[in-house]
């Protein structure tokens, strides 16, 4: 118990900082950083330096843990939980002890750029465009009325204003349907509001 209470984290315990990368880094980035640092402090290049062997072993251990998906997940869990015990001791604990401390874990960093979300959203308009092209090619006398009938279907289709039992569209999207951007010049009242005259 005293070891846990008197524990002070060392810089060598933060494998990401040791390798000079981030917790969101890919395996390729981790390997690239490892190669750079390993060349700088390799024991064969510095035979007179006694700390070179120790530093190289720490780098090797950090690379092994962070390049393996399972051990990296365990390390990230330990690191985010900020437990006051070394990672090796955390690894030795039973899984039941680790699970009982699930509440103590901070969430993972958010990505700065979204990767796959943009490809999905850009594929939807392309699909609609291709359907419009097909209707123009397949039906030479297609008119705007037929195009209006082919509008995208929404989940609110089962809701009809004629049916008194169903909620109206205004109940679902009241804010969305009421507010419209206008291209007209702003009113005098709006101008006064923007200029803090009201």
UniProtKB/Swiss-Prot annotation:
Modification Phosphoserine occurs at: 160, 166, 182
Annotated spans, Disordered: 114-177
Annotated protein name in UniProt: DnaJ homolog subfamily C member 12
Subcellular location: Cytoplasm
Tissue expression from the record: Highest levels of expression are detected in kidney, pineal gland, and raphe nuclei in the brain where it localizes to serotonerigic neurons.
GN (gene name): Dnajc12
Predominant cellular place of this UniProt entry's protein: cytoplasm
InterPro entries with a match to the protein in the record: DnaJ_domain, J_dom_sf, JDP1-like
């Amino acid at each position: 118990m005293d070891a846990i209470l008197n524990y002070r984290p060392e810089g060598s315990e933060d494998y990401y900082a040791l390798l000079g990368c981030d917790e969101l880094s890919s395996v390729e980035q981790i390997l690239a950083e490892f190669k750079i640092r390993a060349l700088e402090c390799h024991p064969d290049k510095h035979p007179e330096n006694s700390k070179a062997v120790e530093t190289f072993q720490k780098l090797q251990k950090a690379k092994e843990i962070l390049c393996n998906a399972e051990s990296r997940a365990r390390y990230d869990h330990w690191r985010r939980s900020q437990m006051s015990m070394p990672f090796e001791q955390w690894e030795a604990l039973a899984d039941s002890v680790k699970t009982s401390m699930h509440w103590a874990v901070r969430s993972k960093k958010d990505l700065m750029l979204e990767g796959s979300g943009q490809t999905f959203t850009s594929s939807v308009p392309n699909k609609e465009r291709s359907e419009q092209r097909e209707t123009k090619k397949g039906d030479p006398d297609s008119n705007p009325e037929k195009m209006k009938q082919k509008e995208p279907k929404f989940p609110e289709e089962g809701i009809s204003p004629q049916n008194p039992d169903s909620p109206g569209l205004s109940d679902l999207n009241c804010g969305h349907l009421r507010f419209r951007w206008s291209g007209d010049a702003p009113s005098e009242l709006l101008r006064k509001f923007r200029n803090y005259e009201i």
